[in-house]
From Swiss-Prot:
Keyword S-adenosyl-L-methionine: no
Domain C-type lectin per the UniProt entry, residue ranges: 68-175
Protein's membrane topology: Single-pass type II membrane protein
One GO cellular component term noted in the UniProt record for this chain: external side of plasma membrane
Name of the protein: Natural killer cells antigen CD94
Subunit description: Can form disulfide-bonded heterodimer with NKG2 family members KLRC1 and KLRC2. KLRD1-KLRC1 heterodimer interacts with peptide-bound MHC-E-B2M heterotrimeric complex. KLRD1 plays a prominent role in directly interacting with MHC-E. KLRD1-KLRC1 interacts with much higher affinity with peptide-bound MHC-E-B2M than KLRD1-KLRC2. Interacts with the adapter protein TYROBP/DAP12; this interaction is required for cell surface expression and cell activation.
Gene behind this protein: KLRD1
Topological domains annotated Extracellular: 32-179
Function according to Swiss-Prot or TrEMBL: Immune receptor involved in self-nonself discrimination. In complex with KLRC1 or KLRC2 on cytotoxic and regulatory lymphocyte subsets, recognizes non-classical major histocompatibility (MHC) class Ib molecule MHC-E loaded with self-peptides derived from the signal sequence of classical MHC class Ia and non-classical MHC class Ib molecules. Enables cytotoxic cells to monitor the expression of MHC class I molecules in healthy cells and to tolerate self. Primarily functions as a ligand binding subunit as it lacks the capacity to signal.
Cystine crosslinks: C58-C70, C61-C72, C89-C174, C152-C166
PANTHER family on file: C-TYPE LECTIN PROTEINS (PTHR22800), NATURAL KILLER CELLS ANTIGEN CD94 (PTHR22800:SF252)
Principal subcellular localization: membrane
Location(s), subcellular: Cell membrane
Organism: Canis lupus familiaris
Amino acid sequence: MAVSQTTLWNLISGILGVICLLLMTTMGILLKNLLLTESIQPTLSPGPITELQKGSDCCSCPKRWIGHQCNCYLFFDELKSWTESRDFCASQNSSLLHIQNRDELRFVSSSKYFYWIGVYYSKENGTWLWENGLALPQDLLQTIQTFDTKKCVIYSSSHSVLDVSCEDKSRFICKQELM
């Protein structure tokens, strides 16, 4: 009886060992495929983008852009300075994000990172301006302190607005206004 119990436990151990080996192999293959997929995904190039995707009821957006209220948005994860970000957006026929209303503010608040937006400090006017020269509405974004003005602004999903050096590197949001 003792011999048959030992044989049974050896058999069960062997089967469980094979199952564990198969699970580990499967996990390794899945992890390899995930890493390979992430490494070969194309990065957005500054060239023209012709492949379109449906954005909302009134617009089609370039691939990798997100449509909302007849505008297209690109949440770009490469770190660039404010000027580099602005220039990249311009090369895509867009501009750094200019938030126009609370609905748009809610839409861009879905991200967890800080992003450059199209706001800078004008020493000439002594105020914060959008990239297009319009004044920043006080009721839309949290008031930005101007004690030690660093000149450019990053925004996060917690409605945090920070002034930082324009030379710092950050993610950024480009916006194409289609209407």
